[in-house]
């Protein structure tokens, strides 16, 4: 079987080379072909626009290696973890994992029955308590100073409402129930515009700001919901959070967790945190933030793959996502999921490792860099 696979690969490569260099062979023989190959290799090395092609070749070789060895990501089986029994909310319009805004921390502990998998700083000068079982049944809870819930998030089928809206509803169904989304959030004398574009809608319900995120690649179906109480929202003085080392770390780990929670939804292998590449991505985010640019290629002309090589990070295949302008990792992640190229990295079944680097400008604007790696 391996011999047959090897022969098939050889035939494919031979066919491609013949297609590209047939004319050179007829004109100059093998010497002409070899000279043309060397010249093409030099052109590729010096050509910036072909970096995407180099990436594709790297990914293709990784796939070919798996093909020849008989290994495949199709062998992955998602763990079977039961979903909780969900009921309609009692006091609010929505519940997440049977938890509602204003519930006590004791209520949450009784419902969940376990400690959070991670606790991180968020942009509201409080913390997200992140719960999941191997990234299934994923949700986040934030508490006020009295240990009452005043923030919730989930991207999985844990949402229930009094109006029959669940994670399977579409944008048109949401708007049919709740009307037009709000255009701004007012804090004191300042109005902050809410960018209700195709990707998400924000409504003010029960004195909470409820944001539905939509998947543009799945018929604008709800892909996540975030519920922030008015009190929690007003803790954030501006559009972005207050810059701090704790926030930078929290945003990075949150983006990692959101990515794995999304891969769990699509029954893809979960990613491990790759510490060796963390300096690489953090430095790129810091470079973009300090020098006010946004690009995969830095000001020194180094591509993502050049930077990995510079930092002695080995890989068989690698990819990079970058984002900025969003107020949090939640908005950044869902924006990336609605961008075809970035979505392909997030949902690539062959990646096994991930790291995230975040840098925040003085005005609070975060810059995100994600690296996906298989070694």
Q: What are the residue ranges of the model-derived segments?
A:
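A well-ordered secondary-structure block
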Residues: 158-207, 304-375
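Membrane-interface motif at the C-terminal end of an N-terminal transmembrane signal
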Residues: 16-31
């Amino acid at each position: 079987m391996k011999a047959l696979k090897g022969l098939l690969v050889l035939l494919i490569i031979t066919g491609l080379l013949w297609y590209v260099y047939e004319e050179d062979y007829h004109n100059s023989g093998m010497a002409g072909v070899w000279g043309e190959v060397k010249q093409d290799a030099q052109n590729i090395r010096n050509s910036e626009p072909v970096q995407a092609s180099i990436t594709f070749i790297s990914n293709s070789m990784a796939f070919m290696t798996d093909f020849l060895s008989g290994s495949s990501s199709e062998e992955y089986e998602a763990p079977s973890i039961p979903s909780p029994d969900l009921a309609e909310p009692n006091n609010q319009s929505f519940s997440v994992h049977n938890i509602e805004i204003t519930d006590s921390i004791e209520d949450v502990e009784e419902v969940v029955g376990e400690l959070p998998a991670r606790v991180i700083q968020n942009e509201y000068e409080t913390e997200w308590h992140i719960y999941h079982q191997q990234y299934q049944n994923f949700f986040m809870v934030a508490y006020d100073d009295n240990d009452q819930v005043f923030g919730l998030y989930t991207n999985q089928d844990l949402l229930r409402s009094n109006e029959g809206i669940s994670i399977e509803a579409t944008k048109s169904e949401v708007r049919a129930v709740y009307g037009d989304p709000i255009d701004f959030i007012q804090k004191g004398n300042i109005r902050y515009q809410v960018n209700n574009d195709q990707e998400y809608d924000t409504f003010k319900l029960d004195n909470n700001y409820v944001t539905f995120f939509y998947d543009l690649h799945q018929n604008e179906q709800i892909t996540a919901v975030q519920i922030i109480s008015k009190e929690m929202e007003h803790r954030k003085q501006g559009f972005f959070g207050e810059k701090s080392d704790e926030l930078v770390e929290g945003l990075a780990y949150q983006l990692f967790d959101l990515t794995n929670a999304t891969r769990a939804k699509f029954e893809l292998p979960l990613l491990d945190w790759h510490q060796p590449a963390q300096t690489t991505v953090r430095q790129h985010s810091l470079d973009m933030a300090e020098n006010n640019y946004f690009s995969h290629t830095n000001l020194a002309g180094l591509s993502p793959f050049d930077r990995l090589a510079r930092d002695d990070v080995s890989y068989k295949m690698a990819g990079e996502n970058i984002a900025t302008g969003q107020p949090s990792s939640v908005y950044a992640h869902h924006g990336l999921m609605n961008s075809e190229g970035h979505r392909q990295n997030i949902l690539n079944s062959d990646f096994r490792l991930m790291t995230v680097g975040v840098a925040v400008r003085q005005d609070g604007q975060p810059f995100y860099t994600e690296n996906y790696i298989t070694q």
